[in-house]
């Protein structure tokens, strides 16, 4: 299992953008051009090329030759490499990629003030109760802690919106353990959180608990 992070400390230059665009599909190039905000295009582009870079090094392929598809519920995959599982998440200044030989999910969220009504709407009753039990000053932080863990689980499952957020509970125990409560869910899954930035929450969900201790940082230059 490998987890990589790109910190976008500056916008991509036009030269860097053109170089990265040369690796991706025509459909992805068009998608990037349609974004209103350049930052959204840059995050999407960096995520795509991050996957290509990691997979190309692992399997000795050219980055531009890798072809992506989507599973039944829309999770990206590489049909020619069924054991090359990956997942991408981006928010704010961060692009994160997680890679493993089994299904994996990752989520990073830039924190901002939230309404408890959002938690009541999307969280399970147990999660909402856990949130309300926190001191008011801790609730925003705990909300994003839960949200990132729940999203990482949904992305690891690969079922998208067919698995509602309130259909399962993620519980963070006092000893640091994380458990997922979902009726009739028998597939092993493990969740680890990472503190990559004070203003963000990040979580990875995998089929095995052998998570790396830290993420590996990747520069723009390493992708070119």
Curated annotation (Swiss-Prot):
Record: residues binding Mg(2+): 107, 109, 151
Source superkingdom: Bacteria
BP term (GO), one: lysine biosynthetic process via aminoadipic acid
Region of interest (Peptidyl carrier protein binding), residue spans: 158-189
Catalytic activity, reaction form: apo-[peptidyl-carrier protein] + CoA = holo-[peptidyl-carrier protein] + adenosine 3',5'-bisphosphate + H(+)
Keywords per UniProt: Antibiotic biosynthesis, Magnesium, Metal-binding, Transferase
Matches recorded under SUPFAM superfamilies: 4'-phosphopantetheinyl transferase
Its EC number(s): 2.7.8.-
Pfam families attached to this UniProt entry: AASDHPPT_N, ACPS
Molecular function GO labels: holo-[acyl-carrier-protein] synthase activity; magnesium ion binding
InterPro entries reported for this sequence: 4-PPantetheinyl_Trfase_dom (IPR008278), 4-PPantetheinyl_Trfase_dom_sf (IPR037143), AASDHPPT_N (IPR055066), P-Pant_transferase_sf (IPR050559), Ppantetheine-prot_Trfase_dom (IPR004568)
GO cellular component: cytosol
Co-factor requirement: Mg(2+)
Family affiliation: Belongs to the P-Pant transferase superfamily. Gsp/Sfp/HetI/AcpT family.
Name of the molecule in the record: 4'-phosphopantetheinyl transferase ffp
Gene that specifies this protein: ffp
């Amino acid at each position: 299992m490998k987890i990589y992070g790109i910190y976008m400390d500056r916008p991509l230059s036009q030269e860097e953008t053109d170089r990265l665009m040369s690796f991706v599909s025509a459909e992805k190039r068009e998608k990037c051009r349609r974004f209103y905000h350049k930052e959204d295009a840059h995050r999407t582009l960096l995520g795509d090329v991050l996957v290509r870079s990691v997979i190309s090094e692992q399997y000795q392929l050219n980055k531009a030759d890798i072809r992506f598809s989507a599973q039944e519920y829309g999770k990206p995959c590489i049909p020619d490499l069924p054991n090359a599982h990956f997942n991408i998440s981006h928010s704010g200044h961060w692009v994160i990629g997680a890679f493993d030989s089994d299904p994996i999910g990752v989520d990073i969220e830039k924190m901002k003030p939230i309404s408890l009504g959002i938690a009541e709407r999307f969280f399970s009753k147990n999660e909402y109760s856990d949130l309300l039990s926190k001191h008011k000053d801790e609730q925003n932080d705990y909300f994003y802690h839960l949200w990132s863990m729940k999203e990482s689980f949904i992305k690891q499952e690969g079922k998208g919106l067919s698995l509602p957020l309130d259909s399962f509970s993620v519980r963070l125990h006092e000893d640091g353990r994380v458990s997922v409560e979902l009726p009739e869910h028998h597939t092993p899954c493990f969740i680890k959180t990472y503190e990559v930035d004070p203003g963000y929450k990040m979580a990875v969900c995998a089929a095995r608990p052998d998570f790396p201790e830290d993420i590996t940082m990747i520069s723009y230059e390493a992708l070119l």
